[in-house]
A protein has these predicted regions:
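Mid-domain alpha/beta scaffold segments of enzyme catalytic cores
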Residues: 1-258
Length: 258
């Protein structure tokens, strides 16, 4: 069976509480053998780490999302550092900048993002980035920290090929989610065609951003196959080969040893 790695999901969130075991069964039947659950604040980070520890093939990222930056306190960094020592914790994230919702002041978002980037450098862990309507500021921060970047993933990439090239120059992987399957996404699809095959990832961001043909419904990791199918078709390569490539890329991005 073809094996898939959903590089970014939230299957540990409450929206799956009523039928999580059914979701996990569907994932196994669909060949989604590995997946990463991603924290967004201290509570969800702790929960993601615990969830990963209890589920084979599951890994965790821990960190403070830009929406939650306003609640950050200095002690959070030490707690994240302590939790990072756990075997299934493979990244800091999701961190970054979100200027679409602006749920935390932009200066606060920047400060908290940079503090966690520095923590990732100290821990030598990759970073899972959430970036929305903030690519230039994020790139400026990354370039300032260029000597201390640890690599990682631009999750749910939403920019153009020109923007993707800037992240690639800094050594990041580019991850595509459901929006790449949408009909009105030519710039995103152009990026998906051009990102080098050794730097491309797939994800669902479940329960959000369900791809075609299930758009509008609760998303789940099983649907990562639709993302893989779309990009493989755009690139005119066999689906099985693309699944194998993105599996290895995710293992590389998260420094997961077989």
């Amino acid at each position: 069976m073809m094996a898939l790695f959903d590089s970014h999901c939230h299957v540990d969130e409450p929206k799956f509480d009523d039928d999580r075991e059914d979701v996990l069964t569907r994932m196994a039947e669909a060949g989604v053998t590995r997946y990463a659950v991603i924290g967004s604040d201290m509570a969800t980070s702790r929960h993601s780490a615990d969830f990963a520890a209890a589920h084979p093939g599951c890994y965790a990222a821990i960190g403070i999302h830009p929406h939650e930056a306003k609640g950050f306190v200095e002690d959070d960094l030490q707690r994240l550092a302590d939790w990072s020592k756990e075997e299934k914790v493979v990244a800091i994230g999701e961190i970054g900048l979100d200027y679409y919702y602006d749920l935390s002041p932009r200066e606060t978002q920047m400060t908290v993002c940079e503090a966690q980037m520095e923590l990732a450098w100290e821990l030598l862990l990759p970073v899972a980035y959430h970036i929305r309507d903030a690519h230039q500021d994020m790139l400026d921060i990354m370039k300032r920290h260029k000597k201390h970047l640890t690599g990682g993933i631009i999750h749910c990439f939403s920019g153009s090929w020109e923007i993707a090239k800037e992240y690639l120059k800094l050594g990041y992987f580019i991850s595509f989610a459901g929006p790449v399957t949408f009909k009105k996404a030519p710039k995103l699809q152009e990026a998906a065609v051009n990102v080098p095959l050794d730097r491309i990832l797939i994800e669902t961001d479940s329960p959000y951003l369900a791809p075609e043909p299930v758009r509008g419904h609760r998303n789940e990791p099983t649907n990562v196959r639709y993302v893989a199918e779309k990009i493989a078709a755009l690139r005119e390569i066999p689906l099985e080969a693309f699944a194998q490539i993105t599996m290895q890329n995710a293992l590389n991005a998260y420094s997961i040893k077989e």
